[in-house]
A protein has these predicted regions:
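Short, glycine/charged-enriched secondary-structure capping and boundary segments
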Residues: 1, 89-93, 133-136
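Secondary-structure boundary/capping signal
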Residues: 22, 74, 117-118
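Catalytic active-site module of serine/aspartate enzymes centered on a nucleophile-bearing elbow/loop
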Residues: 103-147
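Residues at helix-coil transition
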Residues: 19-20, 40, 114, 145
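Residue-level signal for alpha-helical context at structural boundaries
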Residues: 32-33, 53, 88, 127, ...
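Helix-rich cap/lid subdomain of alpha/beta-hydrolase
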Residues: 1-39, 45-61, 66
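Intrinsically disordered, low-complexity regions enriched for glutamine and histidine
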Residues: 39-43, 124-127
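Conserved serine/cysteine hydrolase catalytic core
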Residues: 40-112
Length: 147
């Protein structure tokens, strides 16, 4: 039901807080328009259902304990100001204060994944690929180059 009520205004507010660490640039509007369009277009009920399934998976199937089992090359691209946390909008203030600290979570996840590489984007939120595409692309290309 929550997904059926999404609006462009709500999406922008959420993305500004989490994706862009409180900042906003006009070039981010297209991503809000895309999500708002998906959530208001003719397929909006399917989009909402798929989103609900993703939320259910996140809530009911944590994978943190499985990170040490990864055997593929893994690079984590993390914005240190990311505060994304599923459920933070319905959490109590005390619980919310403990969620979404990616400056810590990124390092913890990288330690748990064998041979993981952590690339941090200082001061950036959940979407460094959109916030600073040149910087992100350079880091990605460097990571993909043969060692």
């Amino acid at each position: 039901q929550r997904e059926l009520k999404l609006s462009a205004e709500g999406i922008k507010k959420y993305e500004q807080q989490t994706y862009y660490a409180g900042n906003w640039k006009p070039e981010y509007d297209k991503w809000v328009d895309m999500l708002a369009g998906l959530n208001s277009g003719p397929g909006h009920k399917k989009v909402a259902w798929n989103s609900a399934l993703i939320y259910d998976m996140i809530y009911s199937q944590p994978v943190y304990y499985e990170l040490p089992d990864l055997r593929v090359p893994t690079t984590l691209f993390i914005g240190t100001a990311d505060t994304t946390a599923i459920g933070s909008d319905i959490a109590s203030p005390a619980v919310k204060a403990q969620l979404g600290h990616y400056e810590v979570l990124g390092k913890e996840a990288a330690k748990r994944i064998p041979h993981a590489r952590l690339v941090e984007f200082d001061g950036m939120g959940h979407a460094p690929q959109m916030e600073a595409p040149e910087k992100f692309n350079q880091a990605l290309i460097e990571d993909l180059e043969p060692k």
